Amino acid sequence: HAIDVSREAFWCDKVTGLSQHSWLRAIGWYTMALIDTLDQVDNKDHKYDAECKMLEDAFKDLVDSMLKYQDESGMWYQVVNYGGMDKNYLETSGSSIMAYALLKAVRLGYLSDDYAQYAKKAIDGICERYLKTKEDGSLSLGGICLVAGLGGNGRRSGTVSYTHLTL
């Protein structure tokens, strides 16, 4: 989800500069940005065909890659590439973002209708796991990441060590 082009940060791969941990919300924001951009580009005159094709291919590749990480509950883990690891958890906001991106792409015709089932499964998983009715009848939604980030001085490496901080 991050890169240090200097390759000096303690959390980055010293060859690529990339963070070794993939955060769901970062991936979700990127996925959402791709489909939202495709929706906004005015390409009626086909002036941007090459650019739109590049965005569409990136979107489809990302979605297909992320579906491999979708938990049987329908949700995705906060640190995607460490699903099921102790202290990692199924995260609500990123799973919601992925469901949004999938449904929007189906509606716009960038993905086949078959992809809607993955979004529905995510929404159902969120509701079953984290949507609760309080005593006063109001709803409460949990499992939302409270804090995540990379830091300096050997702290906040992006691992699951602090993913237990949720709403």
Enumerate the predicted regions with their spans.
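Well-ordered alpha-helical scaffold segments within catalytic/enzyme domains
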Residues: W29-E51, S96-L111
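Flexible, glycine-rich surface segments
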Residues: C52, A58-V80, G84-L108
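CBM-like carbohydrate-recognition segments
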Residues: Y89-L90, G94, A99-Y100, A105-L165
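Long, well-ordered core segments of solenoidal/helical folds
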Residues: H1-W11, E56-G74, Y118-D136
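Acidic/His metal-coordination segments adjacent to aromatic residues that form catalytic metal sites
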Residues: E8-S19, Y77-K87, G158-Y162
